[in-house]
Amino acid sequence: MKIVQTVEEVRAEIKKWRRENLTVGLVPTMGYLHEGHKSLIDRAVAENDRVVVSVFVNPMQFGPSEDLESYPRDLERDAALCEEAGANLIFHPEPENMYSSDFSSFIDMNTLTGGLCGKTRPTHFRGVCTVVGKLFHIVEPDKAYFGQKDAQQLAVIRHMVKDLNFNLEVVGCPIIREEDGLAKSSRNTYLNKEERQAALVLSRSLDAAKAQIEAGERNAAILKKNICSIIEAEPLARIDYVEFVDWNTLEPVETIEGPVLNAIAVYIGKTRLIDNHIYFEKEGNQ
């Protein structure tokens, strides 16, 4: 497995692979990899001849008061996980490798980004779309892999690929959870012992809504109210949003008629965590 920093080095490797008619999978990450990321790499390895993992804490998707400087970084640890999973190349650029001093071109979207995380992080998805678009141009993968935990990001990237005619398939992969139900996240490392326990309120509230839906409840307002009451009972938790939206348009829904995304964002202490369930009721699964 190789680790490279420049666009030219990545393209040189890709060129060699393409000469051999090998398929290429891309797993874009911000590093500090965990079992959730490993599940993406595992799937990419299973479905492609060669796999590139990008490890880049993208400054463009962080707001001015967010955790860019404190976001955890450990390339040695990331490389060990990637190698064990069977990745072939890590692309680990410095910011100046991705954004020149006079960089001024961005990918923005008028739909899908105004609600959910976009409501309180107004420049976030412009940064996400721009860096992912650049990675798609640099690597030119056959398939790119994203986790369902960042459900809005997954929907946005799929829409961008369709709008801009990127010649690749976006593959969404299931959320990977800790044994007690907490969705795996690099930001879980911010939590102290008490906060880690409090964070279980996210999956607990979503599971309660899931049970209600399975029992026949279809009113989004009732479900939302019950989720909020569970979260508000946890002293360390503060709700950013609780929403039920159409999974294709991300527009709010009043009735649960799949496919519907139930997405939540909650502050546990100072740490903002997200989680979700997706309901595909017409297909009879999630």
Predicted regions, residues:
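Nucleotidyltransferase catalytic core that binds NTPs
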Residues: K2-L236, V245-W247, I278
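Phosphate/ribose-recognition catalytic cores of enzymes acting on nucleotide-derived substrates
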Residues: N226-Q286
